Design a protein with these regions (language model features):
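Residues that line or immediately flank small-molecule/substrate-binding pockets and catalytic motifs
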Residues: 98
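N-terminal, intrinsically disordered, polar/charged segments of Gram-positive cell-envelope systems
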Residues: 51-83, 87
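Alpha-helical transmembrane segments
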Residues: 33-62
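Basic-flanked hydrophobic alpha-helices used for secretion and membrane insertion
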Residues: 76-87, 92, 101-114, 120-124, ...
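N-terminal plastid-targeting presequences
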Residues: 23, 118-119
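N-terminal Sec/SRP start-transfer signal
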Residues: 1-36
Length: 298
């Protein structure tokens, strides 16, 4: 039997069973369309989920938080561990966001230090990693590890709304004029600018320690703003209201305060209870470390 005979036989059968043929064709078309629609819905769902997760933060960043209670076998999240992480494949950058446990001081600006804010919002980071971590700048540039501004001058980067942290110390705590808040407007609906222009006004970080006799010791450092972050809480809090300096500079300040106060680095006083046993937090390295990889699939 030739191929032409097979084709003729098939055609004749289809013509004799027109209803069945039509239903078969409709079934094939509907089934194909259903498969295409389901695949499309699956792809769209994946894309939507990835977009939703991306809105919460950078999917190529891994956050490592330090667990420092109890388990002695937990590796310390220190500089040695960070270097091991940097050596892994696909790792683009690694940096801790370091905050010392014991650093008493304030940031001053204005005549006679009229405007002030605390140092609790200061973080230390690896200067070679910040730009690679994908932070956006509203103004200025990233500081570098070899940047030198002179003796007792520290380059810093601030969040977009950092200036709103300053308070007017000449106003009472009950005064509505002691602090200007982000988004605050005047009677004409115009935005009220903060007391301090961080890009123009001088800012001084003052370490202070008061001994048992009530005598205060201080040491001052000039802060020079080299860059301002675009506010993005999905990347980190400090992009809005915090301050970042080089890790080495923050550790230098920590050592300077220890020398000023005559004390050693204070251990954390944090405790937790597990299985009825009270455990004190141990000094197990940095509190948080961020790792940037080259691709979300890695």
């Amino acid at each position: 039997m030739k191929i032409s005979d097979l084709l003729r036989l098939s055609t004749d059968n289809l013509r004799r069973r027109k209803g069945r043929t039509a239903l078969t064709i409709i079934g094939v078309v509907v089934g194909t369309c259903a498969i295409v629609v389901m695949i499309s819905l699956g792809i769209a769902t994946n894309v939507n989920n990835e977009a939703m997760l991306a809105s919460w933060g950078d999917l190529t960043q891994i956050q490592i938080y330090n667990y420092a209670y109890g388990a002695t076998e937990t590796p310390a999240l220190n500089d040695e561990m960070l270097n091991q992480i940097r050596s892994l494949d696909h790792v683009v950058a690694v940096t801790p966001y370091y905050q010392p446990n014991d650093l008493n001081g304030k940031i001053l600006s204005g005549k006679n230090g009229r405007y002030e804010t605390g140092v609790w919002q200061c973080y230390g980071a690896d200067p070679d990693a910040l730009e690679k971590m994908g932070f956006d700048l509203a103004d200025g540039t990233f500081f570098t590890s070899d940047m030198s501004l002179g003796k007792n001058k520290i380059p810093v980067m601030v969040g977009e709304n950092f200036a709103y942290n300053f308070e007017d110390t000449r106003k009472s705590y009950n005064s509505g004029k002691r602090q200007i808040y982000q988004g605050q407007t005047d009677a004409n609906g115009n935005l009220v600018q903060p007391f301090v222009d961080v890009n123009k006004d001088k800012m001084t970080l003052r370490l202070s320690y008061t001994d048992n006799n009530g005598k205060e010791k201080t040491q001052d450092y000039d802060l020079v703003v080299v860059g301002t972050f675009v506010s993005d809480y999905s990347k980190h809090y400090f992009t809005d209201s915090g301050m970042v300096m080089r890790l080495s500079d923050l550790k230098m300040l920590e050592e300077a305060y220890q020398k000023l106060s005559g004390t050693k680095k204070r251990q954390s006083q944090s405790y937790m209870i597990s299985n009825g046993v009270m455990m004190q937090e141990k000094d197990n390295g940095y509190q948080e470390v961020y790792v940037k990889v080259d691709n979300v699939d890695n």
